[in-house]
């Protein structure tokens, strides 16, 4: 039966004949359909002629209906003509409820089982024997030989090939003999065999012969694996829809072969639990593919055709649902539609079964105003279908736990209350990072993680290098009063806070959210905590690239720039010079004399070839064939182009003097610097400017390159400090997005035009093919050795069972003397055999483990050396794409020896990205899967950029989430609840795909653009995503098939990153700082000491003693200040040279110090003891203690806020380009050049030899 979308199709029932039999109709002969209108006939015929059908017997796909039908008829006739009739019933009995599930394995099993087994009635031929005198002892007469035959076989089926000098024989009888066993030694004397009685097919003689199975054979063309497989396709089907169900004979062939559908006891678990409702739904009704689009459109029609009156809408829903359910029982296509709308499933998946078995909450059910006939009848989902056609369950509450990167490249949780703008160039950052690590061995760049790459990029920002500062302010009574007077603006205590400039620069960073929230929660009426930016890094810190973390980013730029020109000065990455865009938006090469003249002028002006013309000509073959047509169109528009060219030329003239001065700094052209590999001291930026200037003619880069050059070139070019000026402008004036775009342009150019990268891809394909070959050999050897190990274990078990039986049957002591001596000596012999078997098993087990280790190692090598373009793992139901960067081309992550200890650096844990990435759908996918228009997408994007995702979702799609957790939909002023706070769907509303997506992802986290990326970086979030994906949906089924084989690798990668970054726990240093913070908490007395001073001042008139004490305290404070000034000056004089004037000044200061100390001592002695004086002294000590705690808390909290960021910077600083150091002895940014050191593995054969050398195999592959 022809298959459509992997389901057997059922032709529609024939229509009744028209009343007027003379009317002309259009007829499709193959299906028997007729049509009264040509449009209907043409639509149906067009459906049949699409290449969407599959031949069920051969499995050939992409056929038209007629081709598939013809293929099936041809194959069916082929099986009927060739496959022996007498062999069909035994084969069918063997296949019926067979335990082998895989079809290819079953074919091999049947071929091996029946190759030498024959049945009465079959036509066979005799084999030629070496010794013609040999006859069977049991024969009635001698067996005939083919050489004795002189007649040509001409009797029988004329369709079969006729063999000369051979006669055809028919098996008359078949007798099977059991094996003959020696009763004493228990050895097999004669194995089991079969005898056949043959008669000649021609009825001319009555001779019969007795032969065994080794003397006869079938015609080779009548018993082949292809015929067996075709017979399977015709005869067999799955016994049930359950996973792992066995094969069984189709109902129409059961009576023919004398079989029944009685299930074996060991297979009853695969039997259907209950009869499937609407069995016809398993077969695809022959309807045009437009019906599927109509299904999607019907779901969205609820939004476009909503009535202004809500009550009318509900009434129509009530009337429509019962009729739709009734129609679904009679029409399979209508049933499929209902499955996609409101029909719930009990056996949809494991989680659907669980929900169906749970008893509903009666309280919740009563609160929903659902009509009695509104609930449709539940049906069983038995096949994979469209994801959005599955019944909607409830929001998974997964997306708030995921993370994303904001515009400051901070990893922020989506559940954060303050959602900032995402990083728009994150996709380009991932492309550049994946390219750098995939081709790291080719461009001499060691591996680094995605976190290290992002941290190095952030280390080029002056504020990131200094971090943040936590300010602590003790609020006094006067500051509170002033705060009220200034309408809530707090005044700062000058004694215990920093300057006003720091407080005017509050931090808007969101990293390290737990510590940040902990600090802000410490705010109270008496203490104020603030987090502000520290002063930006100075020029000295920015220039010290070896110790500020930016060395990794510079090494990356340097590695890419090296690919454009080799050390001989030849261009190795050739970009076609002149491009234009045709009317269709396709980039084309521009062939005109004007472009060639400009190239010559550029070449003559600088003295260097910007591009090699001969190599450019070789690339012209790859361009479009219609370039000449574009040339004609461009000639017609020369006038308009000349005006724009003149404007661009005038703009370039304004830029050219400064740019030329940079590119020819110190009279050395940038090409010469690149040839000589002069990257050190920020010369790489001059080379970068030259490469970007050379690619400015490409229209997709022009706007950015102009902006980049304008920002990075200084206004006043220094004759000696230009590279440092460029580097400081690169750090201060360029945003993270600008730096990523500059890097991405280099990656894009190299990946498209570099022959080195293309050669690396070709070598990778060749190497992977040889690794697969080695892995196949290891797997084959592993299978053989595992079978030997299994046999040894079976022999050992049999011997042990034999010993156990002898122990059980040991006679009593009275009969022990009657036992023979031979039997008493058998036990030591068996024990010796057991010891030998155990030794053999241990040795064999080591072989198996070594081969298994080799196979795993080769699997990892295959992942590491596969440099193919990274592809998404698949799509979910809403078109979101899933990526895992560790899938190919990167080293396999390895756990360290001690996972319980916190690593000193992330370099010891070789993880790659450590997360699963989700990208929003493309515009085409959103329009196709979600039925969203271009206008809605553009409006949503504009509002999202200005007001946020939540507001854009509410204005464009009319859906918002209330404070109670319910989702409301507003259209034409009518508000309808789609989902209540208990996650129950409104049964009166048919949800559209976009509505389901908004409720699943929440309005504030909606993924509707390819620029949006979410990260899954925790194991529990990964488990939730896997549980949410539905195996019965087409797209998610394919996605799960891709994720499950690499699930363990994904989990290990996430665990490695979690352990390296301590995402879910504090490190030891953080715990130590938190403990110190607890020891420096303010006491109640320290917080209230200022209010005690105010109470004393407000208590009334001071006494003479109080006045005297205050005066003495002021004198003492003045003396303390003078003593501090003298101490500072003495320290400076001690460090200077000891001249006479300096010594005299030191003596004077020491005399002044002694005098002030005497005055202070006299003041202290003059104070008389008293309660008021003691209280003042106590308050003074309390203030000093509080001040010390304030300074300590500032230090501890500042360290806590910056700890993880500074730790990441330390990891990046510790990164070294080990690969470049091993090849040239220095990093790429330090002008690594010259001949490579010996021992560098570059060729495919050397790489394969190195890989095989790390396995236990002794045979190495020979070079080609």
UniProtKB/Swiss-Prot annotation:
Which keywords, in A-to-Z order, does the entry hold? Chromatin regulator, Nucleus, Repressor, Transcription, Transcription regulation
One Pfam family matching this protein: DDT
The entry's localization annotation reads: Nucleus
Q: Name one GO cellular component term.
A: chromosome, telomeric region
Instruction: Give the Low complexity compositional bias ranges.
Output: 132-147
User: What positions does the domain DDT occupy?
Assistant: 423-483
**Ranges of residues in domain WAC:** 23-130
- Polar residues biased stretches: 280-289, 299-310
Chief localization class?
nucleus
Q: Where is this region: Disordered?
A: 130-153, 275-374, 482-508, 627-655, 803-825
Keyword Nucleus listed? The answer is: yes
Quaternary structure, per UniProt, is: Component of the ISW2 complex, which at least consists of ISW2, ITC1, DLS1 and DPB4. May form a stable subcomplex with ISW2.
Misc remark for this entry?
A: Present with 2610 molecules/cell in log phase SD medium.
Q: What is this protein called?
A: Imitation switch two complex protein 1
Where is the organism placed in the taxonomic lineage, from the top? Eukaryota, Fungi, Dikarya, Ascomycota, Saccharomycotina
